[in-house]
Amino acid sequence: MAVPKKRTSISKKRIRKTIWKKKAYWASLKAFSLAKSLSTGNSKSFFYSKF
């Protein structure tokens, strides 16, 4: 018989949320850094065709 799961505590929920936010922050920082280097032409590791 199916039994409902226990409720996740607020602190655990908050911890998971901050981990997710931190990962998103670093991903956006990397993407912005890459975009900046591409726009200035300083990129050495990212290959793309210049028009």
From Swiss-Prot:
SUPFAM superfamilies to which the protein is assigned, alphabetical: Zn-binding ribosomal proteins
Sorted UniProt keywords: Chloroplast, Plastid, Ribonucleoprotein, Ribosomal protein
GO molecular function: structural constituent of ribosome
PANTHER family on file: 50S RIBOSOMAL PROTEIN L32, CHLOROPLASTIC, LARGE RIBOSOMAL SUBUNIT PROTEIN BL32C
Keyword Translocase belongs to the record: no
Highest taxon listed in the record's lineage: Eukaryota
Compartments it resides in: Plastid, Chloroplast
Stored Pfam families: Ribosomal_L32p (PF01783)
Family note: Belongs to the bacterial ribosomal protein bL32 family.
UniProt xrefs under HAMAP family: Ribosomal_bL32
Gene Ontology, cellular component aspect: chloroplast; large ribosomal subunit
Coarse class of the protein's main subcellular location: plastid
Organism: Oenothera elata subsp. hookeri
Designated name of the protein: Large ribosomal subunit protein bL32c
InterPro entries in the record: Ribosomal_bL32, Ribosomal_bL32_plant/cyanobact, Ribosomal_zn-bd
GO biological process: translation
Keyword Ribosomal protein: yes
